[in-house]
C-alpha cells in the first residue's frame, strides 16, 4: 500500500472528531471563551431529545467581538490570548490554542450549521452570520440584528457527519445531561462571580425553539461552601459539615482554596453516597479520571482513612500555584495539567492536610467526647474506683463497734458519699477484673441509731437493682438471658436430674419476676430454649398487664362518677313506677299502680325533677390502647327543666292515657267527626281545648 496525503477536508474531520468528542466537550470550549470575555451571566441551552446533538446554544454578556476581529474569529490557529509558545508559561486564560471554534465549525457544517451573534458596547446594533467549514463567514454576508452586548454561538447537528457517534450519544441523553450539570456546577464553584443557567429546549420540525425549561443554576451571592452544600442537598449548617479554608498556604508558591467534609456522625455529609468532588488548578477545571485529579483524589481518601474516617464524597479543592510550574497543553480537552516537581508538592500537600484535619476534626471529636482521643504521653496512670466488698465492710463495721465511746469521739467522721479515686499502674490492671456491685447494708453498733438520711440511702440502694440473682441481703442483680441459662443449665449428657426441662418429673415452670431482662448480644435467637424463655416472659408480662387493667377498671367503677346523685330506696321505687306508667303508649293502662295514685306520683316527680336532673352527663372510656388510662367525656351543658312546662306535658299524657276521662273521650270523638286540622291545648283547670287551625 502506497503512502499518500489525505485531503484537507478529511484531515480536519479526523482532527476535529478527536478533539471534540461530543456535546460536553463543545459546551466546555464555548464556556471557556465566555469566561475569558469577562461575562457575568452565561446561558447554556441544549435540546432535550438528543442531549445536544441537534442543538446547542451558549450565550454570554461579555465584551463581544470587535468588528475588525469578526472575519478571523473562527479561522484555524487564530487567538487573542497568546502570540508564541513561550506565553503558555504565563498564561492566565482558559483558552489558548485558537482552534476550538474552527473544529466546531468543521463538525457542524457536515450536516448542520454554526451561527455567531455578537455585539460590543460601542456598537449601535449587533451582527450575526453563519460560519463555513473553513471558519470563515459564509458568502461573506453579515446581517444586522438587535441583541444585547455579548456573544451567542449556536451549533446545529454537531455530530451529523459522524453517524455511529451520533447514534451512540443521542440514544442516552440522560448521561449527557448529568455530565453537563456536573461541568456547569464545577464552573459555578470555581467562578463565584459568574452565574450559569442551564436549560433544556424542545425543537419544532423547522428547528425553532418551542419550549425552554431551566434545569440548574447557582446564585453567586451565596458562599462557595453554601453552594456546595446546596448541590449535595445537605440540611445542617455549613460549619457542622465542612472545613472551609481560603488561601491555605502550602509553600511560598502554592496555596489551596479547599472545602473538606467533616466525616463525623453529627454531620449529614457522612450520609452522601453520590460523588460531589471538584478539583481545579488556577481555576481550570480538572478531570478526576486523569493523572493529576486521580492522584489528589486518592491522596484525600487515604488521609481520611488514616484518621479512621469514611472516604469523603463531597469536597472542593482549587490549587493556586505559579504558572511557571504548570504545563496545561497535555490534553485535547485541557482538563489535566502537569506540575513540576509534583512528588515534592504532593508530599507537602499531604502533610498540610493531615495537620489541618488533626486540628479541626481532632478538636471537634475531643469536644464531643470521642473515645478515640488519645491521652497525653506523660500520663502513665489511670484512675479506678475502689469499691469495698461486703466482707470487708463487715470487718470494718465490727471493728468500729468494738471501739469505746471515748475513742469514737476521737475518730473523725468521714463522708460516706465521697469517692476518692485511687491510681494504679496500667501494667497491673491488665489481669484485673472490675466488678460493679451494689453495696450491702452497713452494720452499726446497738447504741447508735440510724439517721433519716442513712435510712433513705440504704433503701434507695436496695430498690435500684433488680434481677433474679439474689445476694446475701436479698438484693437482686441485673442480668441477661445468657447469664441465667449458663447458671441454671449443665453440660449436655451429664445425666443430672436437676436439669431444668419440661420433661422432668414434677416439673414446675418458673417465670422470672424481673420485667427488665436484657437479651445478651451473644445469645442466639434460633436456640429453642431461648425462644421458650422469651415466650414465658412475654406471657407473664401480658398477664400482669391484663391484671393491672382489670384493677384500674375496678378502681374506676368503685370510685364512680363524682357528680352522680345517690337516690334513696323510696325515690328509686317511685322513679321506676313513674317510668313504667309513662313509658307505655297506645292508651294502655299500667295495672301495677293504682289509678288514684297517679296524680300524687306525678306531682312528687315534678317536685323532684329539678334536683334529679342537675347532674352533668358523663361518659367513661377505657381501652387496651389507652395505656391503662381512663378518660372521661363530660357534657358541660346542664339540663334545665321548667316545672310549668313539665306539668303541662304530664297533664296531657295523663289525660290521653286515662280512658275514663270525659274530656279525653269527648275529644277523641270530636276528632273523628271534625275533618279539619287542629291542635289540642291543656287549660289551667285541667280541661283540654281543641282549636281548629285557621285556613
Swiss-Prot record:
Sample GO molecular function, one term: ATP hydrolysis activity
A GO BP annotation: mismatch repair
Primary residence: nucleus
InterPro entries: DNA_mismatch_repair_CS, DNA_mismatch_S5_2-like, HATPase_C_sf, MutL/Mlh/PMS, MutL/Mlh/Pms-like, Ribosomal_Su5_D2-typ_SF, Ribsml_uS5_D2-typ_fold_subgr
Localization annotation: Nucleus
GO annotation, cellular component aspect: MutLalpha complex; MutLbeta complex; nucleus
This protein's record includes keyword Nucleus: yes
Record key words, sorted: DNA damage, DNA repair, Nucleus
Disulfide bond positions: none
Family matches, as SMART domains: DNA_mis_repair
Family according to the record: Belongs to the DNA mismatch repair MutL/HexB family.
Note: Present with 72 molecules/cell in log phase SD medium.
Complex formation: Heterodimer of MLH1 and MLH2.
Function, as annotated: Involved in DNA mismatch repair (MMR), correcting insertion-deletion loops (IDLs) resulting from DNA replication, DNA damage or from recombination events between non-identical sequences during meiosis. Component of a MutL heterodimer with MLH1, which probably forms a ternary complex with the MutSbeta heterodimer that initially recognizes the DNA mismatches. This complex is thought to be responsible for directing the downstream MMR events, including strand discrimination, excision, and resynthesis.
Name of the protein this chain belongs to: DNA mismatch repair protein MLH2
Amino acid at each position: 500500500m502506497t503512502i499518500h496525503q489525505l485531503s484537507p477536508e478529511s484531515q480536519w474531520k479526523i482532527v476535529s472528531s478527536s478533539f471534540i468528542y461530543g456535546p460536553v466537550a463543545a459546551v466546555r470550549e464555548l464556556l471557556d471563551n465566555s469566561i475569558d470575555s469577562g461575562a457575568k451571566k452565561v446561558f447554556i441551552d441544549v435540546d432535550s431529545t438528543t442531549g445536544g446533538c441537534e442543538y446547542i446554544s451558549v450565550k454570554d454578556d461579555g465584551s463581544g467581538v470587535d468588528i475588525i476581529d469578526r472575519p478571523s474569529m473562527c479561522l484555524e490557529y487564530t487567538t487573542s490570548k497568546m502570540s508564541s509558545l513561550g506565553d503558555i508559561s504565563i498564561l492566565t486564560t482558559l483558552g489558548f490554542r485558537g482552534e476550538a471554534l474552527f473544529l466546531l465549525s468543521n463538525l457542524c457544517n457536515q450536516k448542520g450549521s454554526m451561527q455567531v451573534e455578537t455585539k460590543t458596547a460601542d456598537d449601535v446594533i449587533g451582527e450575526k452570520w453563519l460560519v463555513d467549514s473553513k471558519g470563515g463567514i459564509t458568502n461573506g454576508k453579515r446581517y444586522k440584528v438587535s441583541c444585547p452586548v455579548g456573544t451567542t454561538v449556536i451549533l446545529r447537528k454537531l455530530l451529523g457527519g459522524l453517524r455511529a457517534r451520533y447514534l451512540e450519544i443521542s440514544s442516552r441523553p440522560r448521561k449527557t445531561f448529568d455530565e453537563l450539570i456536573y461541568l456547569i456546577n464545577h464552573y459555578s464553584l470555581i467562578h463565584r462571580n459568574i452565574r450559569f443557567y442551564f436549560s433544556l429546549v424542545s425543537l419544532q420540525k423547522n428547528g425553532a425553539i418551542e419550549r425552554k425549561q431551566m434545569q440548574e443554576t447557582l446564585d453567586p451571592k451565596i458562599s462557595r461552601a453554601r453552594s456546595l452544600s446546596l448541590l449535595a442537598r445537605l440540611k445542617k449548617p455549613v460549619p457542622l459539615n465542612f472545613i472551609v479554608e481560603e488561601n491555605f498556604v502550602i509553600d511560598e508558591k502554592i496555596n489551596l482554596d479547599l472545602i473538606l467534609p467533616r466525616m463525623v456522625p453529627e454531620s449529614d455529609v457522612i450520609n452522601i453516597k453520590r460523588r460531589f468532588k471538584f478539583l481545579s488548578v488556577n481555576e481550570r477545571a480538572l478531570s478526576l479520571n486523569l493523572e493529576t485529579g486521580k492522584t489528589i483524589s486518592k491522596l484525600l481518601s487515604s488521609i481520611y482513612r488514616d484518621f479512621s474516617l469514611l472516604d469523603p464524597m463531597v469536597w472542593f479543592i482549587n490549587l493556586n500555584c505559579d504558572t511557571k510550574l504548570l504545563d496545561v497543553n497535555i490534553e485535547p480537552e485541557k482538563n489535566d495539567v502537569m506540575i513540576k516537581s509534583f512528588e515534592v508538592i504532593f508530599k507537602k500537600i499531604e502533610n498540610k492536610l493531615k495537620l489541618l484535619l488533626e486540628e479541626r476534626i481532632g478538636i471537634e471529636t475531643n469536644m464531643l467526647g470521642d473515645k478515640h482521643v488519645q491521652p497525653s504521653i506523660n500520663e502513665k496512670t489511670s484512675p479506678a474506683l475502689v469499691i469495698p466488698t461486703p466482707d470487708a465492710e463487715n470487718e470494718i463495721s465490727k471493728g468500729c463497734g468494738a471501739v469505746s465511746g471515748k475513742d469514737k469521739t476521737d475518730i473523725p467522721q468521714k463522708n460516706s458519699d465521697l469517692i476518692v479515686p485511687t491510681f494504679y499502674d496500667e501494667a497491673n490492671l491488665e489481669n484485673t477484673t472490675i466488678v460493679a456491685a451494689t453495696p450491702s447494708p452497713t452494720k452499726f453498733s446497738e447504741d447508735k441509731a440510724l439517721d433519716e438520711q442513712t435510712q433513705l440511702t440504704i433503701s434507695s440502694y436496695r430498690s435500684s437493682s433488680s434481677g433474679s440473682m439474689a445476694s446475701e441481703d436479698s438484693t437482686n442483680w441485673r442480668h441477661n438471658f445468657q447469664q441465667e441459662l449458663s447458671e441454671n443449665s449443665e453440660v449436655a449428657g451429664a445425666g443430672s436430674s436437676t436439669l431444668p426441662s419440661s420433661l422432668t418429673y414434677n416439673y414446675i415452670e418458673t417465670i422470672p419476676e424481673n420485667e427488665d431482662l436484657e437479651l445478651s448480644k451473644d445469645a442466639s435467637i434460633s436456640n429453642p430454649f431461648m425462644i421458650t424463655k422469651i415466650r414465658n416472659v412475654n406471657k407473664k408480662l401480658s398477664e400482669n398487664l391484663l391484671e393491672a387493667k382489670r384493677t384500674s377498671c375496678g378502681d374506676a367503677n368503685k370510685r364512680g362518677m363524682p357528680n352522680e346523685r345517690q337516690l334513696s330506696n323510696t325515690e328509686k321505687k317511685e322513679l321506676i313506677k313513674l317510668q313504667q306508667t309513662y313509658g307505655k303508649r297506645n292508651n294502655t293502662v299500667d295495672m301495677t299502680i293504682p289509678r288514684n295514685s297517679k296524680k300524687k306520683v306525678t306531682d312528687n316527680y315534678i317536685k323532684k325533677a329539678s334536683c334529679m336532673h342537675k347532674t352533668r352527663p358523663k361518659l367513661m372510656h377505657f381501652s387496651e390502647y389507652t395505656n391503662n388510662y381512663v378518660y372521661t367525656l363530660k357534657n358541660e351543658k346542664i339540663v334545665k327543666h321548667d316545672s310549668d312546662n313539665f306539668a303541662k306535658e304530664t297533664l296531657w299524657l295523663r289525660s290521653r292515657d286515662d280512658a275514663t276521662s270525659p274530656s279525653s273521650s269527648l275529644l277523641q270523638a270530636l276528632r273523628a267527626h271534625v275533618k279539619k286540622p287542629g291542635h289540642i291545648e291543656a287549660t289551667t283547670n285541667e280541661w283540654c281545648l281543641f282549636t281548629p287551625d285557621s285556613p
